């Protein structure tokens, strides 16, 4: 049975992903922050009926030792890094926190992945905010559209994207 580890499992995308992976026969683990559990009470996991089928572990993207502990315990085949500070408007009020969580948090996950389970697959969630107001000549954003973020959140997601790209090439990881 394949094992998946999801950061941001209490969020909308994380809860839906857990539901999908469970339906495909995966063993699903999620990293949750203590205050995230207190705030959300795993509402989304309860709502979609997966809370009793998912194993959660306490950790934080900014706490490398907690990430290393969880990854060493789970030894996942796939890592889905969906955890982020995802409020664009709030990113203007809290730019340092946004960059730390969304860029340095990605770096922490990549280092744990590289050093503990380098044969796993790694997925990093991105955002259209990476492109800002950029559009192609026909008014559409594509993967070829130049990145031009216009918020701290968008900048942090570009940093995370570039870190994943670097790790994929430098360390030959499946990221």
Give the predicted meaning of each segment.
Residues 1-175:
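N-terminal Rossmann-like NAD(P)+-binding domain of SDR-like oxidoreductases, especially those catalyzing
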